[in-house]
């Protein structure tokens, strides 16, 4: 991902304030509610029958935390996202058969959740930087598919 020094600074400064547990669960939960077809990859998670069930599901929260942990790792390797996410790309492609479009959807949901949590602090400039990052991560995760 090609970010200016200002964009990198904005991304890392905001990320230092992110509660990964809370934001991860909320982002994955919102993905599953807003794009219900993504639920098919989470059959083992139990009750996903209503928005409340999804948002309060402990397995959704735990996996969201795990996803955001991987995203955090990516933020420390912005110059090598393909390498950073190579194993996850292989897992999601070869074993889980996840539609790579879902990575883009989750990135966009994450941006919405960050905007909700940070309000005025999530300026248009910060959003633009995060959009670049989530697009880069989605591309890296989809790399094995190409």
Curated annotation (Swiss-Prot):
Positions bearing N6-acetyllysine: 59, 82, 144
Example GO molecular function = oxygen binding
- GO cellular component terms attached to this protein's record: blood microparticle; haptoglobin-hemoglobin complex; hemoglobin complex
Q: Print the keywords alphabetically.
A: Acetylation, Heme, Iron, Metal-binding, Oxygen transport, Phosphoprotein, S-nitrosylation, Transport
Phenotypic consequence of residue 13 to T? In 50% of the molecules
Q: Which residues carry this modification: N-acetylvaline?
A: 1
Q: Give all S-nitrosocysteine modified positions.
A: 93
Phosphothreonine occurs at 12
What Pfam families does the annotation carry?
A: Globin
BP-aspect Gene Ontology terms: hydrogen peroxide catabolic process
The question of whether Nucleotide-binding is a record keyword is answered with no
Residue numbers binding heme b: 63, 92
Task: Indicate the segments forming the Globin domain, all copies.
Answer: 2-146
Which tissues and organs express this gene's product?
Red blood cells.
In this chain, where does the modification Phosphoserine occur? 44
Kindly state the subunit structure of this protein.
Heterotetramer of two alpha chains and two beta chains.
The UniProt entry's sequence similarity note says: Belongs to the globin family.
Query: What is this protein's function?
Result: Involved in oxygen transport from the lung to the various peripheral tissues.
What's the protein name? Hemoglobin subunit beta
* Encoding gene, per UniProt annotation: HBB
